Swiss-Prot record:
Lineage, uppermost ranks: Bacteria, Pseudomonadati, Pseudomonadota, Betaproteobacteria, Rhodocyclales
GO cellular component terms, A-Z: plasma membrane
Identification of the protein by name: 4-hydroxybenzoate octaprenyltransferase
Function: Catalyzes the prenylation of para-hydroxybenzoate (PHB) with an all-trans polyprenyl group. Mediates the second step in the final reaction sequence of ubiquinone-8 (UQ-8) biosynthesis, which is the condensation of the polyisoprenoid side chain with PHB, generating the first membrane-bound Q intermediate 3-octaprenyl-4-hydroxybenzoate.
GO biological process: ubiquinone biosynthetic process
Recorded metabolic or biological pathway in which this protein acts: Cofactor biosynthesis; ubiquinone biosynthesis
Length: 294
C-alpha cells in the first residue's frame, strides 16, 4: 500500500500520465457520446445516464492515455513533444502505470453495472479498442481510423443504454466519427511527422504524404455528410443542419491553418475540433427543444 504522503507527492505525476492537464482528448471522446445519448433518447436522455457516461469518458480516456504511454515508452523519448512524459523519464514506473490503468478501467466498469446488459457486453470491445490502439501505429497505415472506432464506441454504448439495442443509425454515426477522427488526428499527426518518420511508426500524415491536406478536408466533408444523413434519418430540423454548416465553416478555417504544414498551426487546427464537436452538440440540443420528436 502506498503511504498517504507518498501518494500525495506522486498524484501530480499520475494526473499528468492521465493527461488531465490536457482535456482535449476527453472532449473529443465526450462529444460523440453525448450526440448518441441525445439522439437515442429523442433529445431528453435521463440525467443519470449523462453523468455515468461523462464520468466513464473521463476514466476511460485517462486509462487510454496511460496505456498509450506504456506502449510508446520506448518511442516517446525520441519525439520532441513526448520526451518529458512521466513514464518515459522514469518518474513513474511501469508497474505503477499498469496498476493505474487497471484501476481506472475497473471503476469505469463499475459505473455501468446498473445499465442494460448490452452496455456491459459492449464495454469489452471498447476496452480492447482502447488498449490495442497504441500498438496499431506499428502496423496500420492509417491507425487514426482505428482511433475513430475507439473514440466513437460510446455511440453504440449510449444507444444500448437508452434503447436496449444498437440500431443502424448508431453505426452510421460511428462511421461519421471515424472520418472525423481521421481528419483531426491527421492534423495532430502532421505535428509529429518528422519525428515519426525517424522512429518508424505509421500515421495517416505519413501515409497520405503530399496529399495530407486534401485527405483531411475530404474526411471532414464525408464526416459532415454522414452526420447530415443521421439528421435526415432522425427527422432533425434546421437548427441541427445549421450546426453542421457552422462545423463545416470551422473545418474550412482549418484549411488555412494546415495548408502550409506549419507544426504549431496544425496543432491549433487539431485543438479547434473541440468546437466542431461542441457546435454539433449544442445544435442538436437546441433542435430537439425547438422541434421535439413526434
Amino acid at each position: 500500500m502506498i503511504a498517504p504522503a507518498t501518494l500525495s507527492s506522486r498524484l501530480p505525476l499520475y494526473l499528468r500520465l492521465m493527461r488531465l492537464d490536457k482535456p482535449i482528448g476527453i472532449l473529443l471522446l465526450m462529444w460523440p457520446t453525448l450526440w448518441a445519448l441525445w439522439l437515442a433518447a429523442d433529445g431528453f436522455p435521463p440525467l443519470h445516464l449523462i453523468v455515468i457516461f461523462a464520468l466513464g469518458t473521463v476514466l476511460m480516456r485517462s486509462a487510454g492515455c496511460v496505456i498509450n504511454d506504456y506502449a510508446d515508452r520506448d518511442f516517446d523519448g525520441h519525439v520532441e513533444r513526448t520526451r518529458t512524459r512521466p513514464l518515459t523519464t522514469g518518474a513513474v514506473t511501469v508497474r505503477e502505470a499498469l496498476l493505474l490503468a487497471a484501476g481506472l478501467s475497473l471503476v469505469s466498469f463499475v459505473l455501468i453495472l446498473p445499465l442494460d446488459p448490452l452496455v456491459r457486453w459492449l464495454s469489452l470491445p471498447a476496452l480492447f479498442l482502447a488498449a490495442s490502439y497504441p500498438y496499431t501505429k506499428r502496423f496500420l497505415a492509417i491507425p487514426q481510423a482505428y482511433l475513430g472506432i475507439a473514440f466513437g464506441f460510446g455511440i453504440p454504448m449510449g444507444f444500448a443504454a437508452v434503447q436496449g439495442e444498437v440500431p443502424a443509425i448508431a453505426w452510421l454515426l460511428l462511421l461519421a466519427n471515424i472520418f472525423w477522427a481521421v481528419a483531426y488526428d491527421t492534423e495532430y499527426a502532421m505535428v509529429d511527422r518528422p519525428d515519426d518518420l525517424k522512429i518508424g511508426i505509421k500515421t495517416s500524415a505519413i501515409t497520405f504524404g503530399r496529399f495530407d491536406v486534401a485527405a483531411v478536408m475530404l474526411c471532414y466533408a464525408v464526416a459532415f455528410g454522414l452526420i447530415a444523413a443521421v439528421g435526415i434519418a432522425t427527422g432533425r430540423g434546421p437548427w441541427f443542419f445549421g450546426g453542421i454548416a457552422i462545423a463545416a465553416a470551422i473545418a474550412i478555417y482549418h484549411y488555412t491553418l494546415i495548408r502550409d504544414r506549419d507544426r504549431a498551426r496544425c496543432f491549433r487546427a487539431f485543438l479547434h475540433n473541440n468546437w466542431v464537436g461542441a457546435v454539433l452538440f449544442v445544435a442538436l440540443v437546441i433542435d430537439y427543444v425547438a422541434f421535439p420528436a413526434a
